Amino acid sequence: MKLLSKIMIIALAASMLQACNSPGGMNKQGTGTLLGGAGGALLGSQFGKGKGQLVGVGVGALLGAVLGGQIGAGMDEQDRRLAELTSQRALETAPSGSNVEWRNPDNGNYGYVTPNKTYRNSNGQYCREYTQTVVIGGKQQKAYGNACRQPDGQ
């Protein structure tokens, strides 16, 4: 839990720095980099103990930030909203291996979420592996992740 708090503090600090650095606040690429880095750090924190866990956090944050920045650079607010809603729907209701697609008619960007294996983690939470694919400006990017249901049901 202490590690998660440190990650969130770092993410918040990076967010404030990015917002101050960009005219008009945080841009799409900065948001993608920040969210990707925080998500990667959180995912990396699930592996190893002690120094091994710190390595996992560092590697996860770096890879997440790079991928998030690339994706975020081309996604607008509507793209992000469509992707988020589709992810929630796919993870809640779609059978494993099926694609649930979103498409932004205003710019032609699209993507899909493919839920995979459902399992219970060591804390007893129900989790699901998934693949998220986005096509922004004709370029495809893929990301892999795990989502776990929280105690409040979300």
From Swiss-Prot:
A lipid is attached at C20 (N-palmitoyl cysteine). Its main location: membrane. It is found in: Cell outer membrane. Residues 1-19 form the signal peptide. Pfam families: 17kDa_Anti_2 (PF16998), Rick_17kDa_Anti (PF05433). GO terms for cellular component: cell outer membrane. This is 17 kDa surface antigen. The gene is omp.
